[in-house]
């Protein structure tokens, strides 16, 4: 079933509402959620690999060794990067650089390398305290569905991550033009 304008409105509303709380999570709290996410992704590794074989026709060995594994590798890299990232930094001219979440992020991913693309967009947004609406390719929705289950099991609050299946001309366009989507 493809999403529509009502689904987009519901997801944007949920993400905007959740942003008010999630954007105030400490770096430590966000790291804990990312570490939980890693544990659940590792536990659901085979489900991710099988979903990409089913939805894309990739050989299972390739799905395991390259596709599903890339998502876990990216997640580990983002965890390490966040650990080193200062929230405030004095730059060379004396100004203070403050890093803060931008808001609601609408993330649209292609059919190829689905978990790779999802993790490269969703994880950095969650790491810095943004809320997300993911619209995966309508041709590869299975891995995104499993990823949404992983997010929920990892303990992210409701509304922080939202999944809408739909096509680009409908859901993609609505998300891209929505006044309450910040990025």
Report residues per predicted region.
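N-terminal Rossmann-like NAD(P)+-binding subdomain of aldehyde/semialdehyde dehydrogenases
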Residues: 1-94
């Amino acid at each position: 079933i493809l999403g529509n304008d009502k689904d987009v409105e519901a997801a944007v509303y949920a993400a905007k509402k959740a942003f008010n709380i999630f954007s105030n999570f400490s770096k430590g709290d966000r790291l804990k959620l990312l570490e939980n996410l890693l544990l659940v992704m590792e536990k659901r590794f085979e489900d991710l690999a099988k979903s990409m074989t089913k939805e894309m026709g990739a050989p299972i060995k390739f799905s395991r060794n390259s596709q599903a594994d890339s998502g876990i590798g990216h997640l580990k890299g983002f965890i390490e990067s966040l650990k080193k990232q200062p929230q405030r930094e004095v730059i060379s001219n004396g100004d203070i650089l403050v890093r803060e979440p931008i808001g609601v992020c609408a993330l649209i991913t292609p059919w190829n390398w689905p978990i790779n693309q999802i993790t490269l967009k969703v994880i950095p947004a969650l790491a810095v305290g943004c809320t997300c609406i993911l619209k995966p390719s309508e041709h590869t929705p299975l891995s995104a569905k499993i990823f949404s289950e992983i997010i929920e099991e990892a303990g992210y609050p409701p509304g922080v991550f939202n999944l809408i299946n739909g096509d680009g001309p409908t859901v993609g366009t609505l998300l891209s033009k929505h006044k309450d989507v910040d990025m």
